[in-house]
């Protein structure tokens, strides 16, 4: 079966569980400029082999905007790939609070997962907090 390609582009995040299908390539792009108060949790469940996810978040924080969120990548089967890349530029008193979890079950061999968060602190009052 040929690879199924999915592209998700959003300007906000919400609590959600996204199934990354067998033989699929999913790209999730978030372009965030408006913050929120309560933490948001997004789960990505890999239940089929040869599934790939690219999660890309661009954050521009201004004023007192807050961006608290968590991603969870559950690799339940072998031969899955996940790449999480969070980039932020924080101005004024803005804050980004990112927690990234990658869970690989004992039997999913040949799984590849990567997570990175890079923030430009463009104000002495801006804050960033990352838990990989």
Segments predicted by a language model, with ranges:
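Conserved beta-strand/loop scaffold segments within soluble protein domains that form the structured core
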Residues: 1-132
């Amino acid at each position: 079966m040929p690879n199924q390609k999915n592209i998700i582009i959003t300007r906000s995040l919400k609590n959600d569980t996204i199934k990354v299908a067998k033989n699929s390539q999913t790209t999730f792009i978030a372009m965030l400029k408006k913050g929120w108060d309560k933490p948001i949790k997004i789960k990505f469940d890999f239940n089929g082999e040869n599934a790939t996810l690219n999660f890309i978040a661009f954050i521009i924080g201004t004023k007192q905007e807050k961006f608290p969120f968590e991603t969870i990548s559950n690799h339940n089967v072998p031969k899955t790939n996940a790449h999480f890349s969070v980039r932020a530029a924080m101005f004024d008193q803005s804050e980004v609070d990112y927690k990234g979890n990658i869970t690989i079950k004992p039997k999913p061999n040949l799984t590849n997962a990567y997570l990175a968060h890079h923030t430009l602190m463009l104000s002495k009052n801006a804050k960033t907090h990352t838990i990989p």
